[in-house]
């Protein structure tokens, strides 16, 4: 109990410091398609219509992007997805509706396991099924990063995140630019530089790093920043978070990946509770 109170106190301090068409098979609600490899779904605007983003009178905030057909790909020209296929349809005479899902494990809101960019961890079997659920669930701090820079060592230092804070969600210019709502990949997204990642590892107790685009690492530091984070197996990266219209501050975070044995990544459902 004392440890929990201390963690919450540290988060309070951190907030103060950090302020600176198979047509017959498909419909608008349940899309279908006639080619096994075709992407199918409703447009983003239509998909968003009627979707719940808050629950419990605004107490619970869903910070997971819907897995819609026009999710952004990481890089321009990359395969987009996920692909949802209504394989069996009652509208076509079957006794049930049955969909299939085909997607990359690093699409949309997702988690990186340590083996994503560390072969030693991958060979040791450190997959998403072995991620620490205690770390994925608990008090978290949502901060706004400086908007004129990647997350460098200088930017990290300016956030004044105190020791003891284990989970931080970083909202960046990516949210302002609504990059997760654009189908085409955009390599000018904001992320951690190598020195920013190293500063976090060396100077904080943060073990869960969340960010608002498909990669926690800036494109020019794509490999090197990941290597810094994954040098040790106790840091979890959650990417592609939907942080639009969420106030900076302290929340209870709950994130649950799929139990994909042998996979270095997984779709993940994340919510914040005020």
From Swiss-Prot:
Gene3D superfamilies per the UniProt record, alphabetical: Putative cyclase
GO cellular component: extracellular region
Free-text tissue specificity from the UniProt record: Highly expressed in leaf sheaths. Expressed in leaf collars.
InterPro entries per the UniProt record, alphabetical: KFase/CYL, KFase_sf
Conditions for induction: Induced by cold, salt and drought stresses. Induced by abscisic acid, auxine, brassinosteroid, ethylene, gibberellin, jasmonate, kinetin, reactive oxygen species and salicylate.
Subcellular locations according to the entry: Secreted, Extracellular space, Extracellular matrix
GO BP field: L-tryptophan catabolic process to kynurenine
Signal peptide coordinates: 1-18
Keywords on record: Extracellular matrix, Secreted, Signal, Stress response
Molecular-function GO terms, alphabetical: arylformamidase activity
Summary of the function given for this chain in its UniProt record: May be involved in response to stresses.
Family label: Belongs to the Cyclase 1 superfamily.
Protein name: Cyclase-like protein 1
Originating species: Oryza sativa subsp. japonica (Rice)
